Design a protein with these regions (language model features):
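Conserved catalytic cysteine-centered active-site region
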Residues: 57-110, 142-152
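N-terminal extracellular/periplasmic Venus flytrap/periplasmic-binding protein-like
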Residues: 11-13, 24, 28-33, 44, ...
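Acidic, glycine-rich active-site loops and adjacent beta-strand->loop/helix elements
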Residues: 10-13, 56-60, 88-92, 116-121
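Short, well-ordered amphipathic alpha-helical segments that serve as non-catalytic structural scaffolds
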Residues: 27-42, 68-72, 96, 147-154, ...
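N-terminal beta-alpha supersecondary unit
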Residues: 18-41, 49-62
């Protein structure tokens, strides 16, 4: 079995749904920007060496639909490089990396780019039209349990207090802020250039 190695990793900054700086950036453009920079960062790597592109996405519709991975490939790599989308909800990006590893282990690929992209500004959490299975809805509605209710059930089952959750969240954010201030993430976060055009009194104004 061939060994698989992660030789480089890169990501965009994290945005804020509906009102963050990346709210108007398409997820395919976001991923393409990162991939182009990633390929440049790896010494000796050329786009044509990539055997496959695997993209994780939890809601593959609208701006994230139409086999998005293929279009990301066309935007960032030679047209000969294929791509496909994998959906395992919140674990989609990680599953993409697992599949890349499996392809290399099996000998069906030598070089794979894998990760995930998502815009919760452009595509809502449950998509634009949920069409749930009637039999499941009637007989096993818990199969469609959302993450919020899942959290409530876990809190009850494992006796997790609200204060404990809030403290964990606070400490997590504090660690992230400290890491950013100490430039710990500088090598893995690639900045995204964003331009917004607004019209005020008939005059166009550009904000970058």
């Amino acid at each position: 079995m061939k060994e698989a190695y992660i030789v480089s990793g890169l990501r965009s900054p994290v945005g804020k749904a509906k009102k963050g700086g990346l709210r108007f950036v398409r997820p395919d453009d976001l991923a393409a920007t990162i991939i182009k920079k990633l390929v440049k960062n790896v010494e000796g790597l050329e786009g044509k060496m990539v055997d496959d592109l695997i993209v994780g996405n939890a809601v593959p519709e609208a701006e994230q639909g139409m086999q998005m991975a293929r279009y990301i490939s066309l935007l960032s790599l030679p047209k000969e490089v294929p791509g496909f989308v994998i959906n395992r909800y919140c674990g989609s990006g990680l599953e993409a990396i697992h599949l890349a590893c499996a392809k290399i282990n099996s000998g069906s690929a030598d070089c794979v780019i894998a990760g995930g992209t998502e815009s919760m500004s452009m595509v809502p959490m449950t998509g634009y039209k949920s069409a749930l299975n009637y039999n499941i809805s009637q007989n096993n509605p818990e199969y469609y349990l959302n993450m919020g209710l899942t959290a409530e059930k876990l809190a009850l089952e494992y006796d997790i207090k609200r204060e404990e959750s809030d403290l964990f969240s606070l400490e997590s954010h504090q660690k992230a802020v400290k890491a950013i201030e100490n430039k710990v993430f500088d090598q893995e976060i690639h900045p995204i250039d964003v331009e917004e055009i607004t019209v005020v009194d008939g005059k166009r104004k550009s904000n970058k």
